[in-house]
A protein has these predicted regions:
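Catalytic domains of carbohydrate-active enzymes, especially glycoside hydrolases
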Residues: 24-36, 148-152
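N-terminal glycine-rich anion-binding loop in soluble enzyme alpha/beta folds
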Residues: 1-27
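Hydrophobic faces of well-ordered beta-strands that scaffold small-molecule active sites
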Residues: 5-10, 32-36, 58-62, 85-89, ...
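Active-site-adjacent beta->alpha loops and helix N-cap segments on the catalytic face
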Residues: 15-20, 40-54, 66-73, 91-113, ...
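Structural motif
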Residues: 28-29, 81-82, 151, 201-202
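Charged helix-capping and loop-helix junction motifs
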Residues: 47, 72-73, 138-142, 188-196
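Conserved anion-binding
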Residues: 2-4, 70-155, 159-164, 171, ...
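Glycine-rich phosphate-binding active-site loops on the catalytic face of alpha/beta enzymes
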Residues: 84-94, 181, 191-221
Length: 229
């Protein structure tokens, strides 16, 4: 049986905190990798630090969202970080950009797997209408999943609340953020889900930040393992 795949979100701009999370974020019962987002990537020394992380899957969550030439060039500029396994780009960038990034990634580093970010987990149905969308989040995410498939992305990033409908039409990797352990606050997230339910509904990997990295990491990982049983 495969170990549950968990990406710990290193949501910090301090290398010392990243080291703490990596040092304590271990378990023989989980397949743990590390997600580096914009906050860490913009910090001094981040590229060198990321390039030296060994033995774990590296997920670079940049959510690229620009014109084709710019996003393609951004991928090429990452060629010195050879241990990257996943990079995200945003569905809002559009078909031309997505296809250009897929092409650029193949040339730059063939082991990079591209994940298309669908509707952010901090967005609700009411807030999505304010930015001009007339469809429900579920319908929009389904269209974005089909776009990912058509453009050659390896997977998508999708809220747990949309998993059931997406799983029927998308067979690639589905990474789910906004995961909360029982009793934990949702914080700024609007569409959260528990880890066991996420895997049950079709997620292939989870991104977990605050529920694991805040406080006693070892104890929080034990809580996660218990919930997954």
């Amino acid at each position: 049986m495969k170990k549950p795949k968990i990406f710990l979100a290193l949501d910090t701009n301090k290398i010392s905190e990243a080291k703490r999370i990596i040092a304590y974020g271990k378990s023989s019962k989980l397949d743990i990798g590390y997600k580096f987002g914009l906050e860490f990537f913009y910090a001094k020394g981040s590229r060198e630090f990321i390039s030296k992380v060994k033995g774990k899957k590296i997920f670079l969550d940049l959510k690229l969202n620009d014109i084709p030439a710019t996003c393609s060039a951004a991928i090429r500029s990452l060629k010195d970080i050879k241990n990257i396994n996943y990079i995200t780009l945003h569905a809002n960038a559009g078909e031309e950009t997505i296809k250009a990034v897929v092409k650029s990634a193949k040339k730059t580093n063939s082991k990079i797997r591209l994940l298309l970010v669908t509707v952010l987990t901090s967005i609700s149905n009411s807030s999505i209408k304010k930015i001009g969308h007339t469809k429900s989040i579920k319908e929009l995410v389904k269209k974005q999943a089909l776009l990912a498939k058509a453009c050659g992305c390896h997977g998508i990033v999708c809220a747990g609340t949309d998993l059931k409908s997406v799983k029927k039409i998308f067979k690639g990797e589905i990474v789910t953020p906004a995961i909360r352990l029982k009793g934990d606050s949702a914080g700024d997230q609007k569409r959260v889900i528990g880890p066991k339910e996420a895997f049950k509904n079709g997620s292939t990997a989870l991104v977990m930040g605050r529920s694991i990295t805040k406080g006693n990491i070892k104890k929080n990982i034990s809580r996660l393992i218990k919930e997954l049983k």
